[in-house]
């Protein structure tokens, strides 16, 4: 067939015919008619359409309404002979011009087998959720991207040009009687003047078969760009491009260090237990648009630097957790401020060092987080330089089923206690001023012979806002810390989800798939072993108020009895003479000393020992320094 005839094709949709007088030994009723008729015997009432609209199935209601109206048309006004589909070029051009009612009125009723649809885009997409597995591989047909009609036996391809691009309906097959030829109806279109949509040639899928009153939303790939579209978004509406909009900006409202190393990310000083604001916003090419699909999920986590492997990080986290006052102590907490909750939702504490939430890229999101560990909490040695930590933010597409984030950024932090961050900044400012002063003095001495005056060298201003640095690596998995006991509890309550193929096909939310199996994340479950030490030893540093040097009290057992024995051994005070034993915190709170405080909250702590004589004995108070 010539190229000229191909360029003049109009949309001709082939639909199954209803009751028709027999001819050419064909049956009067085809199986397609019987299948479609089964959905049209009951009229589409207003209640039916309303229910379908409520369920988000507006396209199905429109498609069924069109087919229902089609079967009301008399047979002699809606039929066209199929045998003319491959005749001469004149017949082909003549058939392409049958879009008007005048041409349709000249058709003969006995030979007509094809319905001519006017230039109305019809969405005949089918729902993938209703697939029958037994039919997925029976009718696998591959079609080339050529725009010409394909002369395949039993198959007629009709080309559409001047219409709004819509999804193509997959090949539909129904069983036929003996002696009947198998016919497959294919709808194909070409897109024009729609630069935002990818070419849909070869978009046919064999495994998308369902009832004709269903719809589906499909994701497709063109080169390296992925675009996602819901069924409710029209063809003329903006399509949310996940990759092109994957540029985000995160800021931390904390003082930035004045000594930034070249080539490394920003360094920020934080105070332990103090809340800091993090702002998340989109800065990509799509920022000026109102995205119809605009929800993303971000995970904020505290991790170690990249030079620490997974085993090292887990080792540090387990050591830190073993020294906490309570097993429920988290590394990272998020505040329940109203200012924060107005911009985010679906908050989940997915790990002890990570929280996740959803937010709208059309709006700026703001959260308040606090870090509960010091940089020096990962070593038992005193005076050791603290380990650098990072606040890392991974942002995932909310509807994308990939474990790969669309954006990742980080900020280095050092965590201090008791306003140590402010002291560190002041020290850096003093050092910078001294260095600037020395440099200015030496330069003035070199230019002493000249009469010109040197301008003062401006000092680097401290910034109260730190910008996160984008990480190019989107494939490495962050280390999420969940203690063994808490992990077992999560398993029993069904709150841990694994990254499996079944779940990926099920379409669950991304964060629920972030946890890898316990054997992969934490290593194989260790077998029960005897404790290396029969009892846990506790070491206290105490001194009297008049002394300058501390004494070390080694408790043979982490109990009140063990503490009294250590005091008796060190200071010669009989155990039976100790009537009361108290602990006074830094805030001045006086509590009775018990075994739990000694075992979990007092190891390597420093105290001032005060012994007061009473009638019934001595009252011993350990005042925390």
Swiss-Prot record:
One Gene Ontology cellular component term attached to this UniProt record is:
chromatin
UniProt note on tissues of expression: Expressed in keratinocytes (at protein level). Highly expressed in placenta, prostate, brain and kidney. Lower-level expression in a variety of epithelial tissues such as thymus, lung, salivary gland, mammary gland and digestive tract. Expressed in the cochlear. Expressed in corneal epithelial cells, but not in the endothelium or stroma.
> Where found?
Nucleus; Membrane
Please list where the region (Disordered) is annotated: 1-24, 82-112, 428-453
Site (described: Important for activation of transcription): 423
What inducers act on this gene? Expressed in proliferating cells, the expression decreases during senescence. In keratinocytes, expression levels decrease upon calcium exposure.
In this protein, which residues make up the domain named Grh/CP2 DB?
244-482
Q: Which domain of life is it from?
A: Eukaryota
In the UniProt record, does the keyword rRNA-binding occur? no
In this chain, the stretch annotated as Transcription activation covers: 1-93
Could you tell me where the Polar residues compositional bias lies?
98-109, 440-451
**Alphabetized PANTHER family for the sequence:** GRAINYHEAD-LIKE PROTEIN 2 HOMOLOG (PTHR11037:SF17), TRANSCRIPTION FACTOR CP2 (PTHR11037)
Q: Its biological function? A: Transcription factor playing an important role in primary neurulation and in epithelial development. Binds directly to the consensus DNA sequence 5'-AACCGGTT-3' acting as an activator and repressor on distinct target genes. During embryogenesis, plays unique and cooperative roles with GRHL3 in establishing distinct zones of primary neurulation. Essential for closure 3 (rostral end of the forebrain), functions cooperatively with GRHL3 in closure 2 (forebrain/midbrain boundary) and posterior neuropore closure.
- Protein name per the record: Grainyhead-like protein 2 homolog
Which source organism?
Homo sapiens
